[in-house]
Amino acid sequence: MTSLDSVLDKDGVRLTVDDAVATVTLTNPAKRNAQSPALWRALAEAGRALPGSVRIVVLRGEGKSFSAGLDRQAFAPEGFDGEPSFLDMARGSEADLDATIAEYQEAFIWWRRNDIVSIAAVQGHAIGAGFQLALACDLRIVAEDVQFAMRETSLGLVPDLTGTHPLVNLVGYARALEICATGRFVHAEEAERTGLANLVVPAD
């Protein structure tokens, strides 16, 4: 592939490739890169579209925030255009709900493939699904202004987008439980000290 080929650009996700390095960018800074089912499908597609020559994948978000997490439109009765609402999914069968969550999780699981090293470059807010997306990567380089938080419990949800397993592996069970149960912010100094962040760099 030639330098900086654009492989995919849809639904708030852009994938570019420069030889052995791919960059996946969340491209909706006006909404702080809030996440939706369409974005999750685009992330999963980005993983499938990676050329075999890629060895490093950098994940970043445009604007001041990496990702503010799930778009609040998910909790509106009408949900997202063309998507079943979360309320409708909750009323459906357990098997259907499990299948839908498994589909969403495809956006988060490919970052730990054994043929690549994935690096999340995280600035500003990384909340809920944004925190879980950063946790999906092998490494995290964070700006001094980073704010991680697992806010699902305050919404009556569980963090079911694969984030709890790597969180426990990084910081231990008790601290992971406390972070999830309280929904508090984890800032750069604590993130580096506890192993959530591999490196802290100045914010732009």
Segment roles from a protein language model:
Residues L39, L43, Y104, I127, ...:
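Amphipathic coiled-coil/heptad-repeat helices and related helical stalk/stem segments
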Residues V7, I109-D204:
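Crotonase-fold acyl-CoA enzyme core
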Residues R32-N33, S65, L157, L199:
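Short strand->helix junction
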Residues P29, K64, D145-Q147:
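A short, glycine- and basic residue-enriched loop/turn
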Residues V24, N28, L43, L59, ...:
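Terminal peptide-recognition signature
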Residues G12, G47, Q105-F108, F131:
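Short hydrophobic/charged patches on amphipathic alpha-helices used for structural packing
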Residues M1-E62:
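Conserved CoA-thioester-binding segment of acyl-CoA-metabolizing enzymes
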Residues K31, S53, G61-E106:
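Glycine- (often His-adjacent) and acidic-residue-rich active-site loop
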